[in-house]
Amino acid sequence: YYASRGLGDVYKRQGGYFSGPKPVRLLRRLLTLANLGENDIVLDFFSGSATTAHAVMQMNSEDGSNRKFILVQLPEVCDEKSEVYKAGYRTICEIGEERIRRAGKKIKEESPLTTTKLDIGFRVFKVDSSNMEDVYYRPADVKQAQLDLFADNIKPDRTPEDLLFQVMLDLGITLSSSVDEEMLDGRKVFSVADGYLIACFDKDVTDETVKAIAKRHPFYAVFRDSGMANDSVMANFEQIFETYSPQTQRKVL
């Protein structure tokens, strides 16, 4: 009863409830018994309608903490006869995402004075194959005319954001870190964790682009191999960083 009522508060306009949701009140009680620290991370590997996220945000709003949550859920398809399917949600994951949005908004609306700094943002990821092409061929199997086909080792359907988050995982950078986009020398650049990592995956990257990034003195700088405007830029790449930011760790995809 309390579970459906709690979810109903968030989905009251949808005309139906999620089947068998966990009650927010129960999750909050369990989290309290766990004696969580103010910056702890809560994991839920059967997240369903994202009640755990709702409970964590509610607790943060009450005591000013900054706990985070990681939710994992298989993309189970909703019953076509259900109310949530009729409302446009195709998987349980989509329901959970909308639940988090609405719950966060509702918490802020109910306590505007005490939730000004409450972080209700979240990111959604899915398990996928590598962004990199499978280019393992024996020399005897490759003809000279085919070499241009292997100039770019990144799959054509992958976005700059896909590459960025793969790099963050490879470097052990928290996926909840701040990510800012800006233009440097006419190229889109990602600045992660206030410049700890700076990445540029655009095409036609010039010496000036590399120099502008090096002058920011990031701990990590990442570029796309095929993104360099010409061989000269690739040849000068290391020297530019040695001149302006020798301590920066450089990586090329």
Segment roles from a protein language model:
Residues 1-11:
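Single conserved hydrophobic/aromatic residue that forms the stacking wall/gate
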Residues 7, 65-68, 120-122:
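Short glycine-/polar-rich loops that comprise or flank the Walker A/P-loop
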Residues 12-18:
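Class I SAM-dependent methyltransferase Rossmann-like catalytic core
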Residues 19-26:
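N-terminal pre-P-loop "Q-motif" helix
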Residues 27-106:
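Conserved S-adenosyl-L-methionine
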Residues 45-47, 56, 71-76, 126-128, ...:
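Active-site proximal loops enriched in glycine and acidic residues that flank catalytic Cys/His/Asp
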Residues 84-167, 172-176, 181-184, 188-190:
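SAM-dependent methyltransferase catalytic region
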